[in-house]
Amino acid sequence: MKKLLLALLILLTPGLAFAAFDHSHAQWDTLAKKHVAWLPGGHASQADYKGFQADHQALKAYLEGVSAVSQADYDGWTKSQKLAFLINAYNAFTVELILTAYPDLKSIKDLGSLLKSPWKKKFFVLLGKERSLDDIEQGMIRAPGSFDDPRIHMAVNCASIGCPALRDEAYVADKLDAQLENGVVRFLSDHSRNRFNPQSGRLEISKIFDWYAKDFAARAASLETWLSAYADRLADDPRHQQVIREKKAKLDYLDYDWTLNDKR
């Protein structure tokens, strides 16, 4: 039945089955530029979900194109094209999930239940299979040997204030590395979520680094080693930066703010 529904979706969308996929992600790029805004300082962003709601048909059109991509087509893409596709799909489908209940929610967690988190809801088709947001992040992006880049944790957006910013543009293959690095720099420069505490001498960082510590350690000797490369972002005082570079600061994890990252 699911395969039949996918086939019908493709057949009923003119040109979708045979058109080459647009790796500029122009439809999503237009929506993001229109409905995502950086907050003062440029470290965090807000989404205008009311605006996304008004442009819901445009969002659906983009997601229909994403859902129409076959596994065979995907397999023929470059690594950067694949990762940009998955990040954009995750972020756009997250907005779509929020719109299923907007404005009657305060957090994406309101869309879950005691038995199932919102990230495990299978509500869309991707590469020919019914998927959840967790399927994209945990099963595809974080799959060992697929991309192995911890910077993705500053790219996929969970529609929450505690989450690294939703970008006001689409991720694209030819500038993906720069976009991922920029996301890390912006997030670690936000001292409301990542900072050195001079009173305690400890590094207070987002809970993301606790949840996914092994991803960061896999690219360095340890999480502390990975963080040390960004000492100048985590602290303003050169003395505190040196403590971070020498990996002498103990780590504390800050509470995560699951409040919706809404403009309202």
Where do the PLM segments sit?
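Sec-dependent N-terminal signal peptides
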Residues: L4-T13
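Single-residue recognition of alpha-helix boundary sites
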Residues: T13-P14, Y102
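Sec/Tat signal peptide C-region and signal peptidase I cleavage site
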Residues: G15-A19
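Interaction/scaffold regions that mediate signaling and macromolecular assembly across diverse proteins
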Residues: A20-I87, N91-R264
